[in-house]
UniProtKB/Swiss-Prot annotation:
UniProt entry keywords in alphabetical sequence: Aminoacyl-tRNA synthetase, ATP-binding, Cytoplasm, Ligase, Nucleotide-binding, Protein biosynthesis
Family named by the database record: Belongs to the class-I aminoacyl-tRNA synthetase family.
HAMAP family assigned: Arg_tRNA_synth
Protein's organism: Chlamydia caviae (strain ATCC VR-813 / DSM 19441 / 03DC25 / GPIC)
Main location: cytoplasm
Subcellular location: Cytoplasm
Name this protein carries in UniProt: Arginine--tRNA ligase
Gene designation per UniProt: argS
Reactions mediated catalytically: tRNA(Arg) + L-arginine + ATP = L-arginyl-tRNA(Arg) + AMP + diphosphate
Quaternary structure annotation from Swiss-Prot or TrEMBL: Monomer.
Length: 564
């Protein structure tokens, strides 16, 4: 990807270290952003790490490294403490870097070697409502897809819908025996599912007939297939309404797609001597795991593992995936570890780098318990999104009493959905987080509203000056400390993208945008813009903030507004 300040400085330090100490064969510099301004812009900790290898004092190592680093682009290079090297870039270097950054921001950051990336996310089950658990998978997966595409990768967004299995035999049987039931919408279908499930649990004969219908469905029985397609279509329409609200683009490729490949998966695993019979089921055992991966049940039926293996192989062989990412809750971590081990053993994955399970934690209520209704059921996602929009309307009425009901109605959906997405994405994905409308709709703090307020502030500057588009052709001229801090923050955008891609964690992006917004607010406070002798140069910084905020918010799946 675009060379970042961090990667550029790393290359300088690597060359300097190898020049100073040619006896070192391989070396990867340890450069970090400085945590405090008096430590400069970046800090190098290599001298301490090399002390034992080189049998030298860290400060002497640091001095030798510094002697081999070109000084022209720095205001200062200081050795501090036991041997930390603190780097501060010159204003001239930052000015030149801003011009390059501006061009790349307009044309797009691009990786040198684009990959085919398949991201499997959301994945609700047919005949069931999407609930709050699907929220995390959907928006984390969407964010990662946006970021991978932003840097030039070819991204496939797949919805591995649960559209096959015993539940369909149960539903089909119930519909055949209760033809008066109306299933014109998902709400009725969900009620129907509960009725069918209750009968399946209580009535042994109904259970047998349901299992017979599963076999009939698998065999392609016309009447069973017709009902199955009807059930799927109703659910998919309801799912699409939610995807429209969340601005999610995703391609359906459900479990049923892989049905034709399941027998050959079992045969292939047997041919490769990977199958062990355990309690009449076909399993794959792996060293280091206490349980096996069951790939065929004792009754001869297939399961999730069989389908997931078929999907893994198809995505590599047919989709040409260089990278496969599956976004589900952390509770499925062991399943995907076993799946990866089996796929590697079978040759379905070329290497361990090909597959990543992106796990996430729970959404909790204010008491720290799993977020559910009072009756203990999962909260329906559609109801949660509707509530977010209503809460955003109330927030706007409180903070913007002067705007019309029409304006409130047009802005509230954007503010409400932005707030929900940002609150989720700003939490480390593996952590649980407490869901709070009150916190996520605040104008202060690490919220979507806080970012949007800065973006809207820039739109206000443009309106007051009668400017439609801010000029990115100006020449930057950093003078004040808050200008320098803002310039440095802008130039760190590619670093945030790098971290997000490396660890598959969107919170690096939200942390960056929050930091950038704080630096912009300090700049806005300290540096007079409109009518000042530095108006042109400062509007240039505003233009870069505007574009960076818009780009960053888009990567999170958030929308911008010109007014709040």
């Amino acid at each position: 990807m675009t060379m970042t300040l961090l990667s550029y400085l790393s290359s300088l330090c690597r060359e300097a270290t190898l020049s100073a100490f040619p006896q070192i064969d391989t070396f990867s510099p340890d450069i970090t952003q400085s945590t405090k301004e008096h430590f400069g812009h970046y800090q190098c900790n290599d001298a301490m790490k090399l002390a034992r290898t080189l049998k030298m004092a860290p400060r002497a190592i640091a001095e030798a490294i510094v002697n081999h680093i070109p000084k022209e682009i720095f205001t200062s290079i200081e050795i501090a403490g036991a041997g930390f090297i603190n780097f501060t870039f010159s204003k001239e270097f930052l000015n030149n870097s801003l011009k390059t950054f501006s061009e790349e921001l307009s044309s797009g950051f691009r990786v040198k070697d684009p990959k085919k990336v398949v991201i499997d996310f959301s994945s609700p089950n047919i005949a069931k409502d999407m609930h709050v658990g699907h929220l995390r998978s959907t928006i984390i997966g969407d964010c990662l897809a946006r970021v991978f595409a932003f840097v030039g990768n070819d991204v496939s967004r797949l919805n591995h819908i649960g559209d096959w299995g015993t539940a369909f035999g149960m539903l089909i049987t119930y519909l055949q025996e209760e033809p008066s039931e109306d299933i014109e919408n998902l709400e009725d279908l969900t009620v129907l599912y509960k009725k069918a499930h209750a009968r399946f649990a209580e009535d042994a004969e109904f259970k047998k007939r349901s299992q017979t219908n599963v076999v009939a469905l698998q065999a392609g029985d016309p009447s069973a297939l017709k009902l199955w397609k009807q059930i799927c279509a109703i659910s998919e329409r309801a799912f699409q309404k939610i995807y429209n609200i969340l601005d999610i683009a995703i391609e359906k490729r459900g479990e049923s797609f892989y049905n034709p490949f399941l027998p050959e998966i079992i045969q292939d695993l047997e041919n490769k001597n990977l199958i062990t019979i355990s309690d009449n089921a076909k399993c794959v055992f792996h060293e280091g795991f206490s349980i096996p991966l069951m790939v065929q049940k004792s009754d001869g039926g297939y399961n999730y593992a069989t389908t997931d293996l078929a999907a893994m192989r198809y995505r590599v062989n047919n989709d040409g995936a260089d990278k496969i990412i599956i976004v589900t809750d952390m509770g499925q971590s062991l399943h995907f570890q076993l799946l990866e081990a089996t796929a590697l053993a079978a040759g379905y994955l070329p290497n361990k780098e090909t597959f990543s399970h992106v796990g996430f934690g729970l959404v909790l209520d204010s008491e720290g318990k799993k977020f559910k209704t009072r009756s203990g059921e999962n909260i329906k996602l559609k109801e949660l999104l509707d509530t977010a929009i209503d809460q955003a309307k109330a927030t706007l009425k409180e903070h913007r009493p002067e705007i019309s009901d029409e304006e409130i109605s047009s802005r509230a959906p954007i503010l409400g959905i932005n707030a929900i997405k940002y609150a989720d994405l700003s939490s480390h994905r593996v952590s649980d987080y407490i869901f709070s409308f009150e916190k996520m709709l605040r104008f202060e703090g690490n919220t979507a509203m806080f970012l949007l307020y800065a973006y809207v502030r820039i739109q206000g500057i443009k309106r007051r000056l009668g400017i439609e588009t801010l000029d990115l052709e100006a020449t930057p001229n950093i003078q004040e400390p808050s200008e320098e801090a803002l310039a440095l923050a802008l130039l760190r955008f590619p670093e945030a993208i790098d971290l997000t891609l490396k660890d598959l964690c969107p919170h690096f992006l939200t942390d960056y945008l929050y930091m950038l917004t704080n630096k912009f607010n300090a700049f806005f406070r300290d540096c007079h813009i409109e009518g000042s002798s530095h108006q042109k140069e400062r509007l240039y910084l505003c233009a870069l903030v505007e574009k960076t905020l818009a780009a960053g918010m888009h990567l999170l799946g958030l929308q911008t507004l010109d007014k709040l």
